[in-house]
Amino acid sequence: MTLSTLILTLSAFRVIFQTMKTTNHPAEEHSYHHGNLFSALLDSAEQELIERGIEGFSLRGVAKRVNVSHAAPAHHFGDANGLLTALAARGFERFIQRQRDFRRRAPADPRAQLEASGVGYVVFALENPAIFRLMFSSDRPDFNDSNLQQVAESAFEGLVKHVRAVTEDKSSPKQDSAMMLDVAAAWAAAHGLADLLVAGRLDELRSIAPRTRDRRIAAIIGRAISFLPNRR
């Protein structure tokens, strides 16, 4: 083999080696902007949760769906619980927005607004059962996480605000203990119905057209909160 042939052969091997390195390099460095990867990981985490459940959820499974190294989700979220925490926080953001969507279509009357929030609550659970269970029935998310804590508190404060608008006389504000009884009762009504539907109960509500279903949910919520006294 001549020297020139040897140099050409080594050059060819170098090209092949560099190609292999590029092919095996984590895809996140080539296919994703930092923010896009974060969102893609959350989207894939949601799909992983839906298909495999909490017990089968793993960072490796999420990474495989996005075609990145398993270190990528660990870099962004730390561990599986960190990723589930971020997923729960995003769930609460969508949960708040879904209730807002229903309130926009409802009359401005405080009781109608509270009822619409309840419908949004239940419909969100029906549309996102895996996320709903993660938000309310799992110990995996870290509720000491500042972002999750903030959005969860915002959701609760929205409930308090709408119950207060129905029941409180501004000239004689209720004591916190009395107000919280009203809030707890309204919350139990919406959450109880949502939980029953997510668990597969009340099949007649699950099998009808969404618009009819939503009207019936509104009727149930309306009846459940009818005990709340109107403001004087």
What are the residue ranges of the model-derived segments?
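N-terminal intrinsically disordered/low-complexity leader segments
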Residues: 1-36, 228-232
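Short hydrophobic clusters on alpha-helical segments that form packing/core surfaces
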Residues: 41-49, 91, 95, 121
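Amphipathic alpha-helical packing segments from all-alpha helical-bundle domains
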Residues: 100, 143-169, 180-184, 211-227
